[in-house]
Amino acid sequence: MIMNVFPKKIMLLGSGELGKEVAIAAKRLGCYVIACDRYNNAPAMQIADQFEVLNMNNDNELKEVIFNCKPDIIIPEIEALAVDVLKEIEKKVRVIPNARATAITMNRDKIRDLASNELNIRTAKFSYAMNQSELDLHAEKIGYPLLIKPVMSS
């Protein structure tokens, strides 16, 4: 007798193209997929068994949807997310990647700091600026050409 060892109900927090690929793979394994995003008809919602439209930055909305849907596993796939809720929820529901990893990857500064300062991985020169004058100052230190990116985007 073959048993299904995969989670029965997977919740995707973020339903973009990457979420759609995860949903397709999960459904092939016999999982029930709940696709969540801030807008209706996101790519993964088109093939999911169930979908929820919500503001995933809102702690209460996110908790309510998770509580009502009762997933076996939660997969965060979006940067704009109430990570503190994941920290609380992962005590009861499996979250992959976990809340700490999700928090680190949400912001480029956390990723850079982890790689450069904690893991001692060589990186390109980098700095953070909150306004134009700070940017000008850091640009002179780092040198040109340089690449400017927002710390967080989704």
Question: In which residue ranges do the predicted regions lie?
Answer:
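ATP-binding N-terminal substructure of ATP-dependent carboxylate-amine bond-forming enzymes
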Residues: M1-K110, S133
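Active-site nucleotide/adenylate-binding loops and adjacent lid/helix of ATP-dependent enzymes
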Residues: L12, N107-S154
